[in-house]
Amino acid sequence: MSQAQYAGTGRRKNAVARVRLVPGTGKITVNKKDVEEYIPHADLRLVINQPFAVTSTVGQYDVFVNVNGGGYGGQAGAIRHGIARALLQVDPDFRDSLKRAGLLTRDARMVERKKPGLKKARKASQFSKR
């Protein structure tokens, strides 16, 4: 008989993370690499661990993640979102604390598109009165 597995999908900017939680020791594997190796920034690793801290389940689950698209920040946010959704399958009572921490809400902020006639989305070339 196999162990229980809990799955969740998280998204942030252009990143999509497919997350599996398996009861274990708290090891996080991202795209078949250790999380310290895959995400070099310590503050982003803290972001990834937020759902466990909020639900007091630190070190209880091994996390296996496939993530693609976006940069480090977007991928970390997508992983956090996926872990939070997977923890809901573990225990539906976590919903209140995860919702209060804002971890279940998909962050809808996206990069604004570049407009024609402007240098970037909002940056215009310098205005000359004369």
UniProtKB/Swiss-Prot annotation:
Any one of the GO CC terms: cytosolic small ribosomal subunit
InterPro entries per the UniProt record, alphabetical: Ribosomal_Su5_D2-typ_SF, Ribosomal_uS9, Ribosomal_uS9_bac/plastid, Ribosomal_uS9_CS, Ribsml_uS5_D2-typ_fold_subgr
UniProt keyword Ribosomal protein, yes or no: yes
Keywords per UniProt: Ribonucleoprotein, Ribosomal protein
Stored PROSITE patterns: RIBOSOMAL_S9
A GO term for molecular function: RNA binding
Keyword Nucleotidyltransferase: no
UniProt cross-references to SUPFAM superfamilies, sorted A to Z: Ribosomal protein S5 domain 2-like
Pfam family, one: Ribosomal_S9
Alphabetical GO biological process terms: translation
Stated family: Belongs to the universal ribosomal protein uS9 family.
Protein name (Swiss-Prot/TrEMBL): Small ribosomal subunit protein uS9
Top-level taxonomy: Bacteria, Bacillati, Bacillota, Bacilli, Lactobacillales
